UniProtKB/Swiss-Prot annotation:
It is found in: Cytoplasm. The gene is fumC. CDD domains: Fumarase_classII. Pfam families: FumaraseC_C, Lyase_1. It comes from Wigglesworthia glossinidia brevipalpis. Its EC number is 4.2.1.2. The keyword Lyase applies. GO terms for molecular function: fumarate hydratase activity. It catalyses: (S)-malate = fumarate + H2O. This is Fumarate hydratase class II. Involved in the TCA cycle. Catalyzes the stereospecific interconversion of fumarate to L-malate.
Length: 464
């Protein structure tokens, strides 16, 4: 593409492609920050465009922006929101920490689309100006934090929570299906007293149920938006009614109650709300990683591991060992959880690094946040569909381990005491005999008493 359009800004002239929709500040960012490939997430761009649309409507309503200009900005914003012009937002996240260059990228693209709608030529900002008209009543310092919160809320509600709720249901269904299957428990990776497979799976269901609650509750933190605070939180150059009107419109568009922050100084100077919400994603990752590790252990084998669960065979597992099948979905979701936990560290460091009236680590913070939501959403969907739904019990293996377990001796403790019960277990283990044989050899109780007292079905509490 030939570089044959000249634009001027407050620093000087800038050359850029003739037909591109962005302007000088975007082009300068392309030149100055040619760093890696991490582009600004489109979810954030979408939220920024929503804000521009709402700002134009409010400014028009308050008689702060000429109707003709406002309508052109609104129309241009609607076209972008419909899915057009996605390639007009080329900037990477490694830019100014306030997100100013991305805010200006959006301003310039909307301005040029609006200019064209009004019959002008790209770059003729006397018709529609990126700052004076598209960015009216706004600052990057309140717009970018607002877009962060909007994109975060929508990604959680539309992507993560629906997939997480489906996974929770799958575990609930399995817990009911497996409620009559008695198996041996394990603590410290050693044999323990029995429980049902349904009870074991119910703990996974309950973990997800609690995590869903944590995430839903935390969304309230990011439902407050900074819009109207402008540069440092005072609301300079914004109408006193602007923030409330804009919040109301954003709520209507997104079918979510966004409220104007009561203290915009805090909203601009910190990323505490995003940090808080992402901590729930870290917590979720810790829970899912525990669940996936349990499934990996329980399905290990098929002959020399635990092998109590049978997982779907999705693909060959080895390039050298024929017939091998690996728990690949568990491995995939575990890696995702590791990444989210790492993202949480980066977000936390970014959050504590804001100085005075503005946090300037925002592009990195929101990139990591949205990446966490995206990979968790996709990973959970895949884990559920390709693994969890297809999990089956290996009844033969489960019965074998239950029969051989030494920890069934625990049921004798109330009747013969801890020390004698321990002697039975040790003798059975050392001589490779059954608990019953060891008990009779030590002459602690009769065979009939043993059969009455050592019954796994009486050791599992409420199996429902």
């Amino acid at each position: 593409m030939l570089i044959n359009r000249i634009e001027k800004d407050t620093i000087g002239e800038v050359e850029l492609p003739k037909k591109c929709l962005w302007g000088s500040q975007t082009q300068r960012s392309i030149y100055n920050f040619n760093i890696s490939t991490e582009k600004m997430p489109y979810e954030l761009i979408h939220a920024l465009v929503q804000i521009k649309l709402v700002a134009a409507k409010v400014n028009k309503d308050l008689k702060l922006l000429e109707e003709k200009k406002a309508d052109a900005i609104i129309k241009a914003s609607e076209e972008i929101l419909s899915g057009k012009y996605k390639d007009s937002f080329p900037l990477v996240i490694w830019q100014t920490g306030s997100g100013t260059q991305t805010n200006m990228n959006v301003n310039e693209v909307i301005a040029n689309i609006a200019i064209k709608l009004l019959g002008g030529k790209y770059g003729d900002y006397s018709i529609i100006h990126p700052n004076d008209h598209v960015n009216k009543s706004q600052s990057s310092n309140d717009v970018f934090p607002t877009a962060m919160h909007i994109s975060a809320v929508l990604s959680l509600k539309k992507n993560l929570l629906p997939n997480l709720i489906k996974l929770k249901k799958s575990f609930y269904d399995k817990s009911i299906l497996f409620k009559d299957i008695i198996k041996i428990g394990r603590t410290h990776l050693q044999d323990a007293t029995p429980l049902t497979l349904g009870q074991e799976v119910s703990s996974w269901y309950c973990m997800l149920k609690k995590n869903i609650k944590y995430i839903k509750n935390s969304i309230l933190c990011i439902s407050e938006i900074a819009l109207g605070g402008t540069a440092v939180g005072t609301g300079l150059n914004a109408h006193e009614k602007y923030s409330l009107k804009a919040s109301k419109l954003l709520s209507e568009i997104n079918k979510h109650n966004f409220i104007s922050s009561t203290n915009k100084f805090e909203s601009l100077s910190t990323c505490d709300a995003i940090v808080k919400v992402h901590s729930t994603l870290k917590n979720l990752s810790i829970s899912i990683m525990k669940i996936s590790n349990d499934i990996r252990w329980l399905s290990s084998g098929p002959r020399c591991g635990i092998g109590e669960l049978i997982i779907p065979e999705n693909e060959p597992g080895s390039s050298i060992m024929p017939g091998k099948v690996n728990p690949t979905q568990c491995e995939s979701i575990s890696m995702i959880c590791c990444q989210v936990i790492g993202n949480d560290s980066a977000i936390g460091i970014g959050g504590l690094s804001g100085n005075f009236q503005l946090n300037v680590f925002r592009p990195m913070i929101i990139y990591n946040f949205l990446q966490s939501v995206r990979i968790l959403s996709d990973g959970i969907k895949s884990f559920n569909k390709k693994c969890v739904i297809g999990i089956k019990p290996n009844i033969k293996r489960i019965k074998k381990f239950l029969k051989e377990s030494l920890m069934l001796v625990t049921s004798l403790t109330p009747h013969i005491g801890y020390d004698k019960s321990a002697k039975i277990a040790k003798l059975a283990h050392n001589e490779n005999i059954t608990l019953k044989e060891a008990c009779l050899k030590l002459n602690y109780i009769s065979e009939s008493q043993f059969d009455i007292l050592v019954r796994p079905e009486n050791m599992i509490g409420n199996k429902n």
